Amino acid sequence: MAAKEVLFGNDARVKMLAGVNVLANAVKVTLGPKGRNVVLDKSFGAPLITKDGVSVAKEIELEDKFENMGAQMVKEVASKANDAAGDGTTTATVLAQSIVTEGLKAVAAGMNPMDLKRGIDKAVIAAVAELKTLSQECADTNAIAQVGTISANSDETIGEIIATAMEKVGKEGVITVEEGQALENELDVVEGMQFDRGYLSPYFINKPETGSVELESPFILLVDKKVSNIRELLPILEGLAKTGKPLLIVAEDVEGEALATLVVNNMRGIVKVAAVKAPGFGDRRKAMLQDIAILTGGTVIAEEIGLELEKATLEDLGTAKRVIITKDDTTIIDGTGEQDQIKARVAQIKIQAEESTSDYDKEKLQERMAKLAGGVAVIKVGAATEVEMKEKKARVEDALHATRAAVEEGVVAGGGVALVRVASKIAEVEVINEDQKHGVVIALRAMEAPLRQIAANAGEEGSVVANNVKNGSGNYGYNAGNDTYGDMLEMGILDPTKVTRSALQFAASIAGLMITTEAMVGEVKEDAPAGDMGGMGGMGGMGGMGGMM
């Protein structure tokens, strides 16, 4: 086992604080509308330019192992805030730095670290409760656009495109962010349920100009097995021929004789038909077939539940207003399923998503939920260069997370004002000794730090701005974007409550642990021994050369 180096007491705390400051100082320059960019060197490709706190934090590794421990603990604050709310990483880092700095000063002055931590924890619990009372619902499109704009560093186009996407696919709908080909941002909305399976034969195409199949008011047959025998399909096809309506077959596969007969029938105009493979694999395929069945009011024909394809009738088929099938995708628009059943299915999938421990499963469940609930929106980010594209895409993703958080828990006044108001309301938290009281003071002072930093990044004196805001009331605050004071909500400067809450909770949690640290253990860095000159040893044999003379 390698030898270890141990630091105790003040020596450990000084090193840890140095690491905290290096990371936090690099991150906090990005805070606010006038925050600066940070350039990150990449081992390959162009450098990355970003204003995203967590992206900066993740890049930082320090040479001194003890300083690095401090930096890594603050990095954890940013990562946790990012995982929980998708934004607020810089705010969380600023809060953590303030709590650690003030806390370690108090410990050096002889206060009890455990009591300080208890005081900080009490203040945070009271602050979270107060934040909830200040929170206002974020329901309308305008408020959603404002939240997105603030999170995207005052880029109104990003806020507006996210608000439009949410309006079109619903607040539960799936919104994805991709790199686009144009200079401007674009929004593509897929209404209805789309899955990534195209037609099984190009002979089904009835719209040659677009290379797609379009079926108006079709019946939809859902089969959880491979279909290769045409006899199994005959009863359904005969029933359909009488109605004159088209048919979409969604099955594990349609092959051989069955596919050939369907193609011939389609080309002769006897029955308008198209076939696609069912989406997904294994259990996920069964679940997605059931989703389509509920959306279209049909029944999945599966032998394991005693239903045979030969005995299926028109009553077992689902229906929709329209189906569009391309080479790669199938879209079912306006399925005629019962709304109550669709809502129940969405609720069931939501519970599964909440209980799932796998990120991949969660993502797939949320996609299924969105497809049932309304559709999928794709924001295509436009930029002139690859460097700008990466920076812009990160901002759009941040803004999207922030708007989702705002819809979930509401909004509070932005620009660090909410935390200042909370601090003034909870000044009298109940404590049992002076050290705990000082812990509360440390937390309250930290709650002013984001506002001070926003002002400092805008070139103003943080203390003066903080004092002016404290003298006001309600949503009165400082707009660093145009250097004015006023009602933050009226100026459209909003922060999601969830983002502010998460930042405070994670910062206090990890900073509290750092304050109570008394020793640090790290590996001794051993210098690699210099390579010896052993390779020259073979020259000794030269002595025998004398015999040659």
UniProtKB/Swiss-Prot annotation:
The keyword Aminoacyl-tRNA synthetase does not apply. Its main location: cytoplasm. Its EC number is 5.6.1.7. One of its GO terms (cellular component) is cytoplasm. Keywords: ATP-binding, Chaperone, Cytoplasm, Isomerase, Nucleotide-binding. SUPFAM superfamilies: GroEL apical domain-like, GroEL equatorial domain-like. It catalyses: ATP + H2O + a folded polypeptide = ADP + phosphate + an unfolded polypeptide. It is found in: Cytoplasm. It holds the Pfam family Cpn60_TCP1. GO terms for molecular function: ATP binding; ATP-dependent protein folding chaperone; isomerase activity; unfolded protein binding. GO terms for biological process: protein refolding. ATP binds at T30, L31, G32, P33, K51, D87, G88, T89, T90, T91, G415, D495. The keyword ATP-binding applies. Forms a cylinder of 14 subunits composed of two heptameric rings stacked back-to-back. Interacts with the co-chaperonin GroES. Together with its co-chaperonin GroES, plays an essential role in assisting protein folding. The GroEL-GroES system forms a nano-cage that allows encapsulation of the non-native substrate proteins and provides a physical environment optimized to promote and accelerate protein folding. Belongs to the chaperonin (HSP60) family. This is Chaperonin GroEL.
